[in-house]
Amino acid sequence: MVATGGQAQDQSHNQEPGVLCPTSAVTGLPQKRYYRQRAHSNPIADHSFDYPARPEDVDWRSMYPSIQQGQQVSFADIGCGYGGFLITLGEMFPEKLSIGMEIRVKVSDYVVDRIAALRRKGADTGAYQNVACLRTNAMKYLPNYFAKGQLEKMFFLYPDPHFKRAKHKWRIINQALLSEYAYVLRKGGLVYTMTDVEDLHKWIVAHMEEHPLYERLTEEEANADPITPKLYQSSEEGAKVVRNKGDHFLAIFRRL
């Protein structure tokens, strides 16, 4: 355990020092094929992570070079994948700091390099200084990064369904973890969940409705949220579901 902010946002993770990551000649962004990894990772396994002892020890400036004195991360995309929705958050809320948390090393490397490339492209305007990605296990270390009542919004988009009953304990939504999420969420904060697996959706809804610190938004409230339309295909996984004409199951909950 060390006091750290995680991987620096401008660091190259997939090449030898001084060698640029392969980028597209058209977009100038890193090419995903160089960052392929298994679709899911075992969150219970003993991965080796550096993590801070407490939120005060996090070096946020290493991830957000333009962070203002006293400014805090407001939005957390848990299991951010390749960062599509995280980037959308940064564009929608330029005054808010958004963090993506991803357990898979190559995938998190890709997001870090993607953000670095976007920052270079937008250097004249200071674009994308408000988004960052951190490789960590959110199921274990979330309270090490965020203070009580710090977050305004948390996102769980297309999480690993862990179909086998014996692996249900690995699901990112369970009663114990919901209490941790409630701790770092401010009152009135929102938890957004989206999946293409109906069984997992029912599991999420059942567990969150059983928890005393959450209430589900009505359909009218959810539809009025400007973020809702972006949940369907801003992420790479969501876009794949749309292409395949799959189902989306949405549930948004308010912290009481």
UniProtKB/Swiss-Prot annotation:
It catalyses: guanosine(46) in tRNA + S-adenosyl-L-methionine = N(7)-methylguanosine(46) in tRNA + S-adenosyl-L-homocysteine. It holds the Pfam family Methyltransf_4. One of its GO terms (cellular component) is tRNA (m7G46) methyltransferase complex. Its main location: nucleus. Keywords: Methyltransferase, Nucleus, RNA-binding, S-adenosyl-L-methionine, Transferase, tRNA processing, tRNA-binding. Catalyzes the formation of N(7)-methylguanine at position 46 (m7G46) in tRNA. Pathway: tRNA modification; N(7)-methylguanine-tRNA biosynthesis. SUPFAM superfamilies: S-adenosyl-L-methionine-dependent methyltransferases. It comes from Drosophila yakuba. S-adenosyl-L-methionine binds at residues 79, 102-103, 137-138, 157, 235-237. It is found in: Nucleus. Residues 1-15 have a biased composition (Polar residues). Residues 1-22 are annotated as: Disordered. Its EC number is 2.1.1.33. Belongs to the class I-like SAM-binding methyltransferase superfamily. TrmB family. The active site is at 160. GO terms for molecular function: tRNA (guanine(46)-N7)-methyltransferase activity; tRNA binding. Coiled coil: none annotated. Gene3D superfamilies: Vaccinia Virus protein VP39. This is tRNA (guanine-N(7)-)-methyltransferase.
